[in-house]
Amino acid sequence: MKTLTIGDLKARIPIIQGGMGVGISLSGLASAVANEGGIGVISAAGLGLLYKKLSPNYTEAGNLGLAAEIRKAREKAKGIIGVNVMVALSDFAELVKTSIAEKVDIIFSGAGLPLDLPSFLKKDSVTTVSYTHLRAHETCADLV
């Protein structure tokens, strides 16, 4: 199989695990995929529901939960860890900022146009991928 290269990141196994929410793509799955050589992805969607004990405020609980999941994945994994943040989420900006602060390797954004995403990034801070279904299918076809 070909190595998957996205920016400076190189995944030995050309697999990007889907960021499936709510509560499916968390640190356990993402770290397992990363340890096998693929890109493990944590879904940022709905974490406020799973981490409601951390804060009564849904947005705050979601951001605290995302930070916790990224840290757990980092503890378990030696490979590439990313986050999937849907642009359509009302707390998109906060989730992106949390992902950057926690030093994820890559942010995937879909479900809208992430027009303000570049404003959150510093040079060489994190790789970002914006995707649509068509672009994702084209990328997969190129790998095969």
Question: Which residues does each predicted region cover?
Answer:
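Single conserved hydrophobic/aromatic residue that forms the stacking wall/gate
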Residues: 133-136, 140-144
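Short hydrophobic/aromatic-enriched beta-strand-loop microsegments
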Residues: 40-43, 108, 126-131
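N-terminal capping/small domains of soluble enzymes
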Residues: 1-104, 113-115
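A general structural signal for short secondary-structure boundary/capping elements
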Residues: 65-68, 128-134
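Active-site-adjacent beta->alpha loops and helix N-cap segments on the catalytic face
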Residues: 109-124
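Short beta-strand/loop segments at the ligand-binding rim of alpha/beta enzyme cores
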Residues: 78-83, 121-130
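Short alpha-helix boundary/capping motifs
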Residues: 60-62, 127, 143
